[in-house]
């Protein structure tokens, strides 16, 4: 509300909240920092887990930053920007989500200190942008080229990604699976590799132990054969993939057939049977002994398929059909009548097996399959879910190295190198931007500090030791949280793709756009929200003051 000649002028509707200038910046920075503090304790191999309970009572236990923020019902718009940081990091690099969010939170904390010194947000943003650009150059210079055929390097990177998660005890076994899965689906394009993660299917089944998790060089489908009289095992499988129903098509128009005698009814039924039989005969004629159908299969068609010794599975998901095509070399056919022997795929074995009391179809022994399945096992639902998250991270990390061929030491080593080098760069810049660049360098130290703190070590003492060792021995020195001392992380096998820290800097820098906001205008809640309807509250300041 403004005043004009002593008269109040109402611009915004009643109930609207508005925060201006430093208040807006303070509230936004505080909201973002709360998000960073929430996930901070999960960082590193000694990080803690979070238990998240939704409104239905479903529980998620994890220390995966992206999962934690995804499961939380966050309302504040600035806090949502931090969630986007984690999502971007997960999408682009596959790991380092917590690192990106923690760095973003620390950059904002340092920015707030600069704002308190009356340094303009534009100067801070410019300084941070210069520092981030320099950080990318430094990461490129310290990255090591590796042979993407070196399975040992890939395995170490996968083990680093799994360490600290619930599946840690079996990390070597799971890392081997992750490496094999990526190598199997990697395709060479020119002189580089490309990995499409959609070709790696994760299938979860409770029961057994984590050690029972296995990689199937083919596809596992959570279905069963359509007819009890069908074969449950086919060796030397010739596989047909059909994405239409093996049923008599209903007309699209509202047509009526008037039947006046039993003979006409019999002829009608016989024609239906003939049409179904022709479909099945065509499948048999081309030499298929296994058929996967995306839609339904008529009871009569099931009978004939069983009679001819053809194994059939119906209502297979489109994504599974595509994976079957890539694994077996089959072509997906829309019309059965167009099926030819060239459209068939091959597998050494197609078999229905019981897993945890439920039937599943295993398609195995494919020649050079470009789609694979990881069947994840574990004692409880929570264990299976966490193993899946660990394997997803491991697979993405291996993918990054296979595609880029570059690694860096992990364990806080790159962040310490960046902090030291960016701080030296600040002296070259001068002006008020120098203060922002120095703040950026100081903010990066939050990673080694947090790694040490989460391991029960003294953060300051550990940081001083590590920086001293780093300056003396080089950019691969980081925090060994198990020994509680500085160590060469490359020698210890603690490595990460260079894409992870590079993307973390990019993602964190995006959150700095929060500093540009000097006015927050939040509309009042809708009436239906007041009555208990679903909708997010807009009272942003109340929880943050």
Swiss-Prot record:
Keyword set, alphabetical order: ATP-binding, Chaperone, Nucleotide-binding
Q: State the SUPFAM superfamilies in the record.
A: GroEL apical domain-like, GroEL equatorial domain-like, GroEL-intermediate domain like
- The source's superkingdom equals Archaea
Instruction: State the signal peptide span.
Output: none
Keyword Chaperone attributed: yes
Task: Please give the InterPro entries that the UniProt record associates with this protein.
Answer: Chaperone_TCP-1, Chaperonin_TCP-1_CS, Cpn60/GroEL/TCP-1, GroEL-like_apical_dom_sf, GROEL-like_equatorial_sf, TCP-1-like_intermed_sf, TCP-1_chaperonin, thermosome_alpha
List, alphabetically, the Gene3D superfamilies matched: GroEL (3.50.7.10), GroEL-like equatorial domain (1.10.560.10), TCP-1-like chaperonin intermediate domain (3.30.260.10)
Q: Name one Pfam family in it.
A: Cpn60_TCP1
GO MF annotations, alphabetized: ATP binding; ATP hydrolysis activity; ATP-dependent protein folding chaperone; unfolded protein binding
This chain's function reads: Molecular chaperone; binds unfolded polypeptides in vitro, and has a weak ATPase activity.
Its assembly, as annotated, is: Forms a Heterooligomeric complex of two stacked eight-membered rings.
To which protein family does this belong?
Answer: Belongs to the TCP-1 chaperonin family.
| Protein's name according to its UniProt entry | Thermosome subunit beta
UniProt source species? Thermococcus sp. (strain KS-8)
Q: Which gene encodes it?
A: thsB
């Amino acid at each position: 509300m403004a005043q004009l000649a002593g008269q109040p002028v109402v611009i915004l509707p009643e109930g609207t909240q508005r925060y201006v200038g430093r208040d807006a910046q303070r509230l936004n920075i505080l909201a973002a920092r709360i998000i960073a503090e929430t996930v901070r304790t999960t960082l590193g191999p000694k990080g803690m887990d979070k238990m998240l309970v939704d409104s239905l009572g479903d529980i998620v236990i994890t220390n995966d930053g992206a999962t934690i923020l995804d499961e939380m019902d966050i309302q504040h718009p600035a806090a949502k920007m931090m969630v986007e940081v984690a999502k971007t990091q997960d999408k682009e690099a596959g790991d380092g989500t917590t690192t990106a969010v923690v760095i973003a939170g620390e950059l904002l904390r340092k920015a707030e200190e600069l704002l308190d010194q009356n340094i303009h947000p534009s100067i801070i943003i410019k300084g941070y942008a210069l520092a981030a650009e320099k950080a990318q150059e430094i990461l490129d210079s310290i990255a090591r080229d590796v042979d993407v055929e070196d399975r040992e390097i890939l395995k170490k990177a996968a083990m680093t990604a799994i360490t600290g998660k619930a599946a840690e005890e079996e990390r070597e076994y799971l890392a081997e699976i992750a490496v094999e899965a990526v190598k199997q689906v990697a395709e060479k394009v020119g002189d580089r590799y490309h990995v499409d993660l959609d070709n790696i299917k994760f299938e979860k089944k409770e029961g057994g132990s984590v050690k029972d998790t296995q990689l199937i060089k083919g596809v596992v489908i959570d279905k069963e054969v359509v007819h009890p009289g069908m074969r449950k095992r086919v060796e030397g499988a010739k596989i047909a993939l059909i994405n239409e129903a093996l049923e008599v098509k209903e007309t699209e128009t509202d047509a009526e057939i008037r039947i006046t005698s039993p003979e006409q009814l019999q002829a009608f039924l016989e024609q239906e049977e003939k049409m179904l039989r022709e479909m099945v005969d065509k499948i048999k004629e081309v030499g298929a002994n296994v058929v996967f159908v995306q839609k339904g299969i008529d009871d009569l068609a099931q009978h004939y398929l069983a009679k001819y010794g053809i194994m059939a599975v119906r209502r297979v998901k489109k994504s599974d059909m595509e994976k079957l095509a890539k694994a077996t070399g089959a072509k997906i056919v829309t019309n059965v009548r167009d099926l030819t022997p060239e459209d068939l795929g091959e597998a050494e074995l197609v078999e229905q097996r019981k897993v945890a009391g439920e039937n599943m179809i295993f398609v195995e022994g494919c020649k050079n399959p470009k789609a694979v399945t990881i069947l994840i096992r574990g004692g409880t639902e929570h264990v299976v879910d966490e193993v899946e998250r660990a394997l997803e991270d491991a697979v993405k990390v291996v993918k990054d190295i296979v595609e880029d061929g570059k690694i860096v030491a992990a364990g806080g080593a790159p962040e310490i190198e960046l902090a030291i080098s960016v701080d030296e760069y600040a002296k070259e810049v001068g002006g008020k931007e120098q203060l922002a660049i120095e703040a950026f360098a100081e903010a990066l130290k939050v990673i080694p500090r947090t790694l040490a703190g989460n391991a029960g070590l003294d953060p300051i003492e550990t940081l001083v030791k590590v920086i001293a060792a780093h300056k003396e021995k080089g950019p691969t020195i980081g925090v060994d949280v198990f020994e509680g001392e500085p160590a060469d992380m490359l020698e210890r096998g603690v490595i990460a793709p260079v894409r992870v820290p590079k993307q973390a800097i990019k993602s964190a820098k995006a959150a700095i756009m929060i500093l540009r906001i000097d006015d927050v205008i939040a509309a009042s809640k809708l009436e239906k929200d007041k009555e208990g309807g679903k909708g997010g509250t807009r009272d942003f300041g109340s929880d943050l003051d």
